């Protein structure tokens, strides 16, 4: 990089500690999506809430309305941004595509392709704002492991609407028939009964 090709003009994003949160380092990424510009960063929100130690960071997104010539100074917020549109469940989604999770890890399937993997029984993933439209009673899930994955709506402690039974060391495509049609917009939880259950992909049909 030619040192004469640029000029330092100061910072544009405050440390989380300057925004009333715990202090932490940061790794940021700037992105433009549908005409709006954002900053992806991390905070210690989860560590604060769980009262733990060790730098337990979580990914966050905030608005950063920069232009080609100006970067206004902005800060991290606890609320973040609103969801830009509902998720379409009738398209296939990676198990790693989520809003948040607990007790989960990842297993690489191939270059750029990941599955989520439970670290313990009771692990879960949370997909926010899923629009089932006029409704479905069927899912197609690709998963492996020994145990079950439960589908729950709107509350991770809700009664399961569907149960995916697993007994395989390899990924299987499993059709799931639900006892009740799902309609409209819901938050979706996948709850894992035991360790080492992998969810690669899911889709409503």
Regions found by a protein language model. Name each.
Residues 1-205:
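Carbohydrate-active catalytic/glycan-binding domains of CAZyme proteins
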């Amino acid at each position: 990089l030619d040192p004469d090709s640029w000029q330092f003009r100061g910072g544009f994003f405050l440390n989380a500690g300057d925004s009333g949160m715990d202090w932490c380092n940061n790794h940021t990424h700037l992105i433009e999506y549908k005409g709006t510009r954002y900053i992806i960063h991390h905070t210690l929100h989860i560590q604060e809430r769980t009262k733990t130690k060790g730098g337990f960071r979580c990914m966050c997104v905030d608005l950063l309305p920069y232009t080609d010539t100006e970067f206004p100074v902005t800060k991290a917020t606890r609320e973040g941004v609103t969801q830009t549109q509902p998720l379409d469940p009738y398209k296939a989604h990676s198990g790693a595509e989520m809003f948040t999770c607990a007790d989960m890890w990842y297993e690489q399937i191939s270059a750029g392709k990941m599955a989520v993997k439970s670290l313990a029984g009771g692990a879960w993933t949370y997909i926010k704002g899923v629009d089932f439209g006029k409704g479905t009673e069927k899912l197609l899930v690709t998963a492996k492991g020994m145990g079950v994955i439960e589908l729950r709506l709107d509350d991770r402690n809700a009664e399961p609407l569907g149960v995916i039974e697993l007994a395989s060391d390899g990924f299987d495509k499993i059709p799931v028939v639900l006892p009740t049609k799902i309609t409209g917009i819901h938050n979706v939880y996948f709850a894992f009964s035991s360790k080492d259950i992998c969810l690669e992909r899911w889709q409503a049909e």
